[in-house]
């Protein structure tokens, strides 16, 4: 498995993970431009410590459940919302009408960044430290946007 991007919390850090029985690389077999950098390794260790100490996975699950609950509330208002699904804070809202692109365009000037992954599907990927107040604000904007774009 390869890991990168958030691993160093903004510092250029990547990792390659494998089971011990897959270990075939010997020292000197592989090199990279960012290999062995003490600063980025320290950043990665600090990021991992925060993830464990603050139980970020559980926080993401709890906050994601709250977000999905709010989106399910919108599905009661708008019959064209057919499904809300996700894991943690990676959430999708599926519709039976193709307004995702228009919703993205309408949401941006309101301060909400969302992604149309299909013509009928919006993806939400907020930061792991998103607050319930920010989720409430996002859902209020989305409510307004869906009302406008579904006419």
Identify the function of each model-found stretch:
Residues 1-151:
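Conserved N-terminal phosphate-binding loop of PLP-dependent enzymes in the Aspartate aminotransferase
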């Amino acid at each position: 498995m390869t890991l990168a991007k958030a691993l160093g919390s903004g510092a250029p850090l990547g990792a390659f993970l494998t089971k011990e029985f897959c270990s075939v690389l010997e020292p000197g077999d592989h090199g990279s431009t960012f290999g062995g950098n003490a600063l980025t390794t320290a950043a990665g260790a600090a990021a991992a410590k925060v993830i464990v100490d603050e139980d970020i996975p559980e926080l993401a699950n709890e906050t994601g459940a709250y977000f999905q609950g709010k989106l399910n509330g919108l599905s009661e208002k708008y019959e064209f919302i057919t499904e809300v699904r996700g894991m943690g804070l990676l959430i999708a809202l599926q519709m039976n009408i193709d307004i995702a692109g228009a919703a993205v365009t309408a949401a941006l000037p309101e301060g909400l960044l969302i992604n149309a992954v299909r013509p009928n599907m919006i993806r939400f990927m907020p930061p792991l430290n998103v607050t319930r107040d920010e989720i409430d604000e996002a859902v209020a904007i989305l409510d307004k946007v869906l009302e406008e774009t579904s006419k």
